[in-house]
């Protein structure tokens, strides 16, 4: 079972990693995955709903801890016959030995061409030290001691299976000692040049090869000092010798040169842009190290590499640490914004070492990036470890990969695990065995594992590729689906806008910064304005959210054909929390308003409506509707006009100025004469649907001093009474407009009630020119001590639909100031504007001159304003009860008017 599980894990890892160097290096000691070794129904680590976003830790070259056996055998058998197989090295052994002996071949070639014989083996006894100073003797002895140690290491490692790796470790140790010796004399030019000339002339061939290996290693780290040291010898050896030595010292040899050249990192999907964040202010005096250049060349295989350099004025004189960090963060942010402006659809990856990793994390919190890679993340700070409540890095939403060393002093693996559990973003951790803060493995680790630093860096790069491939694949699939969804939304007509809640689409505070590709405009105008949001042809004038109950679904099909006009919403979109708070205030205020109504009155659903935009909406709708061609003749022979739309907006709260007028106060000359008017419409083909838009008014008797009776509704015989209760399904809430500072209302949300009545049309044979048969009800506004308003009856040919909507108003709510000065609203109520609108409505028989020739509008908007605190009585329809007076109420300045009856 264990063998099968191990083979299956091997095959799965081979398919996942392909031909990566990490797979080749760790194939000998790969830890088995417990999920694969378990039963087939085992679930991964992330299947639990409470699983954190921290992925399991990946270990690189970490020796597994094996438990020591407590039982010690007294007699241990020793096998002296079995031959142990030679382990296969992790690199090309033949090519590694070739580059290893490169300096020895150069020395033999140079000494053979020389005229002088080679130095003997006892060359130290033949060295003439006459005239040497104390500094020269000390320097020469230190260099000689380092070269002798290297010679002993070469002899000890000769013939070993991993001799190239052991030789590389010994050469690095010798180069470090030579550098320390030269630094002891402060790299004095005369001393260093004298030392180099003396060593080249007196050293034996093996010792000279070791010396050139040390110089080759130091040339990659401190090229300027080595070039200054070799100036005098180049003039003596000639141009050919100097060129050969320069080519030899160009780059240090590496046992894994063949593996690195044949195993290049694979290109990441999506062609990302890789930003390398510097760990500090850059300076031309200190160029990048050879290892950083190697990293940059390897990362260039993944995508486009853009180093972000930070330059300080006057070499940073007078600049504090905090200012320097702010300058570094600002430089990276500006580079990210610049790339977003030029390549909005390109993924951006931030990679940083040590302090640069911290800068990259802070930038990811401020700007949108696809992923962050932190190499050598410093978890310990001056104020203690990271991960406190106020740590801004805990709010990261960008996927992040942490790569730390097992022996790191600034970041312990266990402390890093605790920090990862607190991060909300998807994160992963790679622990490099035997590595320090800069991910450099120790010499003991190199010897035991047979590794070099370049091989370890290459394996870390494979882990980075594995992490970024998953992140970019998911991001590419998510971004790639957005244009397809947008195209589908554009091609098909949105059937129901009420399913879309705009409040939930607004990003909450502290969320991840939006992608610049997601912020690109999807409409030709350059931005997705509010008009495009609610552009559904079936949306109601103030559509935002609708909750349809099971009892309302029966009439949904019929009523969906009625609401075909759309009014552009001008209110600002609120956030989700503001919408919740205002909706709670709306419910509270609605209960207060309902308590003021007398029992028995029909329920009114209050819908927020912006008082500032009512007049603009009316003008816009009338302008659009008047452009359409309608027949203005009400004669039977004329063509039937299209279905008009009557919108009644009851503003039951707010003391605003500039709102629309009311029906009962909009008097005409006929109305001033005292003639009652009966609004008569022809028998509508959509009368059944119309009844679905009107709620049934419950009749009740007068109760108390502040109640009144309302006339019950008389429904048409062709209409279904059950459909009358479906008006609530068409009433939807919108964002409320801002109330004025002087308003007397308790909440700015409860500002009005909007009824959309549509599909009122005439028969196909035309509108009737004669009065309707039967007694026509009359809409009468009785002059009462308290201000009140009533909406008249609407008669449709053979049937009558009577709806009484009681709203009590005050003088201030109608636009008149307490001082008695008329305002714009008050003037609009008395100048007969509503009568002019009513005269052009088809089906209102004999309201005004039939031969006026005016175009028939398809929309009439009636808005009644009131203040809930003043509601005391309700106006009856027809002849009825006289409500009681309220002492504190104010009288309207205009006298009550009666609409003339139909002839």
From Swiss-Prot:
| Record's compositionally biased regions (Low complexity) | 523-555
One GO biological process from the UniProt record?
A: chromatin organization
Please give the subunit comment from the record: Component of the NSL complex at least composed of KAT8/MOF, KANSL1, KANSL2, KANSL3, MCRS1, PHF20, OGT1/OGT, WDR5 and HCFC1.
Question: Gene deleted: what happens?
Answer: Embryonic lethality at peri-implantation stages with failure to hatch out of the zona pellucida. Blastocysts show a significantly reduced number of cells in the inner cell mass and there is a significant decrease in H4K5ac levels. Conditional knockout in podocytes results in glomerulosclerosis and kidney failure, leading to early lethality. Down-regulation of genes related to cilia and microtubule-based transport.
Q: Which residues carry this modification: Phosphoserine?
A: 523, 536, 540, 772
Q: What's this chain's function? A: Non-catalytic component of the NSL histone acetyltransferase complex, a multiprotein complex that mediates histone H4 acetylation at 'Lys-5'- and 'Lys-8' (H4K5ac and H4K8ac) at transcription start sites and promotes transcription initiation. The NSL complex also acts as a regulator of gene expression in mitochondria. Within the NSL complex, KANSL3 is required to promote KAT8 association with mitochondrial DNA. Required for transcription of intraciliary transport genes in both ciliated and non-ciliated cells.
Q: Which gene encodes it?
A: Kansl3
Q: Which Pfam families match?
A: Abhydrolase_11 (PF20408), KANSL3_1st (PF23154)
Supply the alphabetized keyword list: Chromatin regulator, Cytoplasm, Cytoskeleton, Microtubule, Mitochondrion, Nucleus, Phosphoprotein
Q: Which GO terms describe its cellular component?
A: histone acetyltransferase complex; mitochondrion; NSL complex; nucleoplasm; spindle pole
Q: Where is the composition biased (Basic and acidic residues)?
A: 478-511
Q: Using the UniProt annotation, give all residue ranges assigned to the region (Disordered).
A: 478-562, 626-645, 657-678, 696-720, 761-781, 868-903
Location(s), subcellular: Nucleus; Mitochondrion; Cytoplasm, Cytoskeleton, Spindle pole
**Natural source organism:** Mus musculus
Q: What is this protein called?
A: KAT8 regulatory NSL complex subunit 3
Q: From which residue to which does any coiled coil extend?
A: none
GO MF annotations for this entry? microtubule minus-end binding
